[in-house]
Amino acid sequence: MKLPWLAADTPFPPVEQALRDPDGLLAAGADLSPERLAQAYAHGIFPWYAEGEPILWWSPDPRMVLACADFAPSHSLRKRLRALARTEHDPAARLQVRVDTAFARVLHECAAPRHGQPGTWISPAVQQAYHSWHAAGFVHSIETWIDGELAGGLYGVSLGRMFYGESMFARATDASKIALAHLVAFLRRHQVAWIDCQQQTGHLARLGARPVPRARFIEHIAHAVAQPRLPWRSGRLDSAGMLHPLPPANGVMM
């Protein structure tokens, strides 16, 4: 089967036409404009390609999904989260989880080369595209700060009542998992059932993610993305999933 090439005004083909090998490859071409990305994610499609390649669009079957109700932190992480919850409202707390206070830095850290990987798909062009989408209010960072330093976090796409996880990083033990746990609490508070994890990995499976048939995934997001947007704003995120303004900086609440 010949891979469809998308011009600027070409719609995506049906996801059922995606290749089986490589699994989920649907089309190539087009661009990473906010409008094109919104169209893609709303239909269960995402871009993934190496720098120097044309843009490749994917919709694998099955799809890796973390149901928020099935999030399964390890015993040691649960213990650490309980300890954090006891001190999180203390202004002097060493560890704090925030939303959208350092999006560009999170994106940059997620794009850094990983051990055992030859490169990264989060190229400068991808970073620019998602930064533009963040400015439009559809991409968000969840950040773990320790002693005033960014220690880990993740970013993802939010459409309606659906969240699409993109990438995460950690510079300290459990830092990205702590951010994920707080994100799950926020999403559950706002009746978001699933986080799209895109592809199957052992790391995500250990946290409770499971593969679901693509048809079921598409059926779910068709309803979820049509729901009202979540109340995202920059601030501190507590373990119950509530957002709070940051402490005053020069007398101004953030």
UniProtKB/Swiss-Prot annotation:
It is found in: Cytoplasm. Keywords: Acyltransferase, Cytoplasm, Transferase. It catalyses: N-terminal L-lysyl-[protein] + L-leucyl-tRNA(Leu) = N-terminal L-leucyl-L-lysyl-[protein] + tRNA(Leu) + H(+); N-terminal L-arginyl-[protein] + L-leucyl-tRNA(Leu) = N-terminal L-leucyl-L-arginyl-[protein] + tRNA(Leu) + H(+); L-phenylalanyl-tRNA(Phe) + an N-terminal L-alpha-aminoacyl-[protein] = an N-terminal L-phenylalanyl-L-alpha-aminoacyl-[protein] + tRNA(Phe). InterPro entries: Acyl_CoA_acyltransferase, Leu/Phe-tRNA_Trfase, Leu/Phe-tRNA_Trfase_C, Leu/Phe-tRNA_Trfase_N. It comes from the Bacteria. GO terms for molecular function: leucyl-tRNA--protein transferase activity. GO terms for biological process: protein catabolic process. It holds the Pfam family Leu_Phe_trans. Its EC number is 2.3.2.6. Functions in the N-end rule pathway of protein degradation where it conjugates Leu, Phe and, less efficiently, Met from aminoacyl-tRNAs to the N-termini of proteins containing an N-terminal arginine or lysine. Belongs to the L/F-transferase family. This is Leucyl/phenylalanyl-tRNA--protein transferase. It comes from Bordetella parapertussis (strain 12822 / ATCC BAA-587 / NCTC 13253).
